[in-house]
UniProtKB/Swiss-Prot annotation:
Domain of life, source organism: Bacteria
GO biological-process terms attached to the record: mismatch repair
Pfam families per the UniProt record, alphabetical: DNA_mis_repair, HATPase_c_3, MutL_C
GO molecular function, one term: ATP hydrolysis activity
Membership in a protein family: Belongs to the DNA mismatch repair MutL/HexB family.
Protein known as: DNA mismatch repair protein MutL
Record's function text: This protein is involved in the repair of mismatches in DNA. It is required for dam-dependent methyl-directed DNA mismatch repair. May act as a 'molecular matchmaker', a protein that promotes the formation of a stable complex between two or more DNA-binding proteins in an ATP-dependent manner without itself being part of a final effector complex.
GO cellular component, one term: mismatch repair complex
NCBIfam families reported for this sequence: mutl
Alphabetically ordered keywords of this record: DNA damage, DNA repair
Organism: Thermosipho melanesiensis (strain DSM 12029 / CIP 104789 / BI429)
InterPro entries: DNA_mismatch_repair_CS, DNA_mismatch_repair_MutL, DNA_mismatch_S5_2-like, HATPase_C_sf, MutL/Mlh/PMS, MutL/Mlh/Pms-like, MutL_C, MutL_C_dimsub
Amino acid sequence: MGKIKKLDKNVVSRIAAGEAVAGPFSVVKELVENALDASATKIEIEILNGGKSYIKVKDNGEGMSRDDLLLSIEEHTTSKIEDFEDIYNLYSFGFRGEALSSISKVSKLVITSNDGKESNRLEVIGGKIKDIKEYPTSEKGTIVEVYDLFFNVPARRKFLKSDNVEKRYVVEYVEKFLLGNPDVEIVLKSDGEVVYNAVKGNLEDRFRLIFPEVREFTEVSGKYVKGIISSPSYYRNNRTGQIFFVQKRFVIDKMLYYIFETGYGEALLKHPYGVLFIEVPPRFVDVNVHPQKLEVKFSNPNVIYSDITRTVREGIKKFVSKKIFVKKEQNTVNENKLNYAYGPKSKPFQTNIEKNMLFNVEKKQLEVKRDIVVLKKRYVLFESNDGIYIMDFHAAHERILYDNIIKQLDEKVERLDLMIPIEIKIGKSFLQIAEGRKEDFKRFGFNIKIDKEKIIVLSIPSFIKPSDVVEVLMEILDEYRILGENPKSMKHIIADKACKKAVKTGYDILESEAKQLVEEVLKRGLTTCPHGRPLFLKITYKELDSFFERT
């Protein structure tokens, strides 16, 4: 008998449903998009335990008849298309006819719907209909309730995140939905508490709601694109503040991120905020290139990209004309001993990198044989017993400061109580992250309170300047949003961002300071900066002899 067997249809359907339904947030996404396709103007969402135990989406849309209700949970049943070519003339969100069918197979599903003529209630468990009956309701529309997601697929349920993280995923999706549909009233509740209660408005209202930290922005409009962009002086350390919609559908497209930032030109500092809507005739875009419809393909992308760049460039003229300056640090170094209590502003930390990529500088104390020479206010040259070394002064100073801060964070952190608390107004998804990480913040010297719409900072690590607190906290929250749960990352972000007194390239460096730094680096056996770049260029005497053809 052969080893290959045909899977049972029930097994196949549960596997397929598990692929289509990634987690609570994707259930919410599918149900909300169904509500929009039903012309809903008000949508209410409620979740319990991050959506793992209960999800409810209620809308005031067109509703469904008894026959449509029964068809809605069957595979590939839809009201949006009849043949394949209809995909290229779509204005709706759904079209594959798989959302409710997939959800019903991995949950206990209850749908109550009123189409204005009749009202019915359907109960489905694990894809099998348990009951359908008349169920009088006074309001036209549909209520979908999802209980015990993945109850019959334990392997999938096991891989769901914590309640707090799953809730955040739902909140982040709802924030995108709020931005993409300002003309729809939406309420989001989690474990009985109201997260969002957004009335109908315009894009500016929603932008302020989701990105309260951005105080300077403008509306832009081109041939195919319109939306809101921030001043270059408001930015994040990643692209989580950049949201794109194509035909009102949220998409993730690396090229769109790149083109958007290209429009900022020389005004670009890091990653500015932007919410852009791209509208083209349906036949010019393919929305069927990604399982979750998060990617699209344009038939003539260069036309779209040019319009985005041109539109953004016109928009930022309003800000550039205001002469946005980046504050420059003093171009001097304290003539006293180098301050090793502060650290660098640099890229995210890379762990466990101790190998010099250019030369194998052994981790041992070297003997500096002669005077130290400073080259071009940038490098330090010295001779040792086995050759000539050239050290990057800034990178070396940065490494020492970084290591000192990490050591403090591993031990007891000295706190500075703020006489005037610092208030940081941020979006709900960031508040959600902060709420779940209060103990981590406390461990590393921050005492914070979470309000309904802001973080209140009461104390900070003593080595962080109060003027840097907002930037440090926002970067920590950004990293958690992207990388997930990793307390170690908080430690390295704090060390990386907390201190900005590493001597920069081009600053005047006294020979006494250079000597002090070289001795400290050699004493510690350091070979790389915090990000893995080499500190030294080593040229052995043997290599010199070979170069000059001396034998």
